Structure formats: structure tokens, C-alpha cells
Amino acid sequence: MDRRRFIKGSMAMAAVCGTSGIASLFSQAAFAADPDIADGQTQRFDFSILQSMAHDLAQTAWRGAPRPLPDTLATMTPQAYNSIQYDAEKSLWHNVENRQLDAQFFHMGMGFRRRVRMFSVDPATHLAREIHFRPELFKYNDAGVDTKQLEGQSDLGFAGFRVFKAPELARRDVVSFLGASYFRAVDDTYQYGLSARGLAIDTYTDSKEEFPDFTAFWFDTVKPGATTFTVYALLDSASITGAYKFTIHCEKSQVIMDVENHLYARKDIKQLGIAPMTSMFSCGTNERRMCDAIHPQIHDSDRLSMWRGNGEWICRPLNNPQKLQFNAYTDNNPKGFGLLQLDRDFSHYQDIMGWYNKRPSLWVEPRNKWGKGTIGLMEIPTTGETLDNIVCFWQPEKAVKAGDEFAFQYRLYWSAQPPVHCPLARVMATRTGMGGFPEGWAPGEHYPEKWARRFAVDFVGGDLKAAAPKGIEPVITLSSGEAKQIEILYIEPIDGYRIQFDWYPTSDSTDPVDMRMYLRCQGDAISETWLYQYFPPAPDKRQYVDDRVMS
């Protein structure tokens, strides 16, 4: 299975798939001597027209890889590409009175080879005009671009767009769509982190993963003083097409996106991923194997959180496994799920470049009935922080056949905290380490005689204090091995309880161990469910080596 390798921050290596297939619907025109950057002929547009466009496009053959870029763009380095700036005086909504939002476009070049068309829409008349590429929209600075090669290239298109919000107009963007169908947003820290995608196809199958492209965007002209905007997108790939509507609310402390899509399958699809998101987890409190660095933790997200259709809340800490892992969690009409970054303490990261303590969480809230399916979680081994190695999405139970049509509605919350949380006790942190000794010994003058792995899970909130006098009972289920030395410890600094147990193997198997735990009081659950996957070492590694030199 081939995986994309995006350069974090600039998203510099976009996946290569599909074309727009809409050239016959929107003709080009000569540049207009008009302050409005939209220079194409007017055409009627609304979401129903886009749906028909996507439906008709699915009846035609996919047009394949993008055409070659001019040499001056194809050979750019990331540094050169990032030095190109859009001219803020020619921004999309520059002429809107009392504008609180503005949009700029990304230049084609380097790994961004798929032409993306941009249109400006008057929401009152439903008339759209294309915005054609021309070099004067950009400042090339020290990029070394030979602009003579770009003359007359009005159909070159753009790579994507980003949106700014007052008072940081033209300075710090809050929303970005760039590369394939990837997009991101920030909270009030202005720190980008994980990404979402329009669609995921064959992420974990025996087929090559397919990366659909957003090939065209239509922007409703933003209203004066508004902090909400609407953009429509056409998605295209070898297996499917789609019409998307994004209503994006740029609030003070978060960005909320209302997403509606209509999908049209060209081919049978083995694995269709709805509301996919991509993140990075190198190491954290539970996984220290790859943390030979000055930074205690390195991750964009620390857990997958799920609010199941039956009301159960699940916390699944993320891993950086030595072998690729894919887990599918069955559900029926899920209430929500997301990849969260809940630890906001700088001292836990000590990173003044990545600022992982400021990175947003992403929560998906279905807005229509999604039916039966699974929440898929893929964890890919990584040696550092430059590669996204976590993928999560909803996979419908129903198999996708050529000619099938689907419609999904959901809301995305980009924020420090998800909009909802479990009313019961919640998992704060998961830690692992050497086991087989009494707490506080750690380990003393000699190592334990028998090898074991210790797990410590901290719970906070809910009714833990009220339950404590009645008795808190951890309910632990393991797919293999045994849990011993189970302890319940009150942790005053967090005003919560730590459930600690040692895992002992009962076989030589190195298969992943699925762990499940929740807290119970007098027969009732009083916490969310903790799920974890542990990877036992080989039998010959299950021993403690004392390598001290005493003389």
C-alpha cells in the first residue's frame, strides 16, 4: 500500500489524481479591466447545478494525471515555493465593505500539479465568474520563477486557497484548502495541526490508496461584517465524483464547518472513508519508544474519541506501532468521533517550533443518519514528526458499487476542546512502563524476577468523588494475558483516580493485545471506556537486563 508523504506545514507534496472535467461548462474570457479579479464569463450556479455536474461527470471516464507544469514551476524547491506570496491588494473579497474575512489563492508548483479552478459567485443572482490565473496576482520575491514561461497561461489554475479573518487579514490564515482534498483550520491559537480530507478511498486494502482531488471551488461573495462564508467544491477521482458545500463559521475561539456532500461512484470501491482526518503521533505519555529527543511528547493528536450510537463514550489513546495497524470499531448511527489534542501544557512538549500544545482537536458530528458501519483507525510506524501516520474515518457497512449515490451531512469542529464530552469520568492520560514491582519501589536494588508491563490510566471528572466511599471497581478485559497488581490510587494534583495494573503474558504470542477498561460503582458505569492496543515484545525480550557498571 503506497502512502502519501506530505511535508507538514506547507503540505508540499499533494497526491496526484483526477481532473475537473468541467471545461465545457465554463468558458474563458479575456482579462477584464475591472477591480474584481473574477474575469470569466458569467454562468448560472447553485448547489443543485453542482450536483448535476458531479453526477454527469461520473458517467464519463476519469481523465487521469494532470498535465505537466512549466519547467520553472515543476522544479521548485519547498523554500522557493513558500516564498511566493499572493498580492493582498488583489484578494477575493478586498472590495467588500467592512470585510471580516478575505481569501487568497495558492500558486501552482512543486508537488502541486493538479489545476484547481476558482469561481466567484454572486449569491443574490446565482451568477458565477471564473478567476483565471495571471502572474500579476502574485509576488514572486526570491522564488526564482521565470514569469515569461507563465505568460498566456490563464488556464494554469491555482493549487488551493486560504482564508483570513480580521484583525489578522492577510497576516495569519484560519482556513486552508491545499493538495488533493486536504483542508485544515485553526482555533484561537492560529496553530495548524491535523488535517481533514474530502474523502478517503482504499486506505487499508490490497489496492493502491486513491486520493481524490477538489478540482474547482465556487465562493459565495461574503457579506459585509460577516464571519461566515460558503464555498462549494467539485471532487473528482478515478472511482468517484462529488459535490460539496462547506458553510464555514470563523468564530473567535474555533472554526466550525457544516459539510454536505453528494457522492457518485464511477466504480466499485472496496473501502470508502467519510469525514476522514489525518494526524501525527510520534510519542506521548503512553508510547516512549520513538522519543529519543529533548521533547517529552511529539504529536498532533493524543487520542481517538468516540461517542457511539448507543451512548457509550470511548477513549482510544494513539500509538506509534512498529508494524502498521488498522482497527475498525463497529457502530450504528454514531453521535460523533474525532482525533483530539487535550494536553495543552507546554511543559509536556517543550517544543518552541512545533507548539504541539496549541494544536487543535477535530470533532465530527453527523447531521443525518449514517446507519451501520465502522470508525476506522490506521496507525503507521513513523520515525519522526514530519510524516502524518494516523488516519481516521467512517466507513459505511454497505458495499459501494458503480452507479451508487450517497449523501452525507456532518459538522466539523476545529477547537481546543470538542463541543461535547462524556458526562462520566474521563480518561486524562495513559502511561506505560516496567511492571512487576510494588508502587514506589521502582525498582530498587534489583529488577523484578518476572517480566511484566505496567499500565496507569488516570480518570478525572464525573462522580468519582461521590462514588469513592461506595467503592470504585475497575472492569478490565484483555484479549490475552492476565491483569495483576490492580490498584486504585487517588491523585490529589489532578483530583482524580489512577487505575494501575500489570499485564503478564500467558503465551509467547506477539500479537497485539486489545485492552478494555471502565470504572463501575454498585453495578453502574461511572466512566467512559478506555481502549488500548499493546504490542508485546518477543519472548527473548521479556527480561530485564542490569547493565550497571559498579567498579
Swiss-Prot record:
PROSITE patterns (alphabetical): TAT
Annotated signal peptide: 1-32
Molecular function via GO: carbohydrate binding; catalytic activity
Protein's UniProt keywords contain Hydrolase: no
Database matches in Pfam families: MdoG (PF04349)
Pathways per UniProt: Glycan metabolism; osmoregulated periplasmic glucan (OPG) biosynthesis
InterPro entries noted in UniProt: Gal_mutarotase_sf_dom, GH-type_carb-bd, Glucan_biosyn_MdoD, Glucan_biosyn_MdoG/MdoD, Glucan_biosyn_MdoG_C, Ig-like_fold, Ig_E-set, TAT_signal
Example GO biological process: beta-glucan biosynthetic process
Top-level taxon of origin: Bacteria
Record note on modification: Predicted to be exported by the Tat system. The position of the signal peptide cleavage has not been experimentally proven.
GO CC terms: outer membrane-bounded periplasmic space
Keywords: Periplasm, Signal
Compartments, record wording: Periplasm
Keyword S-adenosyl-L-methionine: no
SUPFAM superfamilies: E set domains, Galactose mutarotase-like
Family label: Belongs to the OpgD/OpgG family.
Purpose: Probably involved in the control of the structural glucose backbone of osmoregulated periplasmic glucans (OPGs).
Protein name, entry field: Glucans biosynthesis protein D
Organism classification: Bacteria, Pseudomonadati, Pseudomonadota, Gammaproteobacteria, Enterobacterales
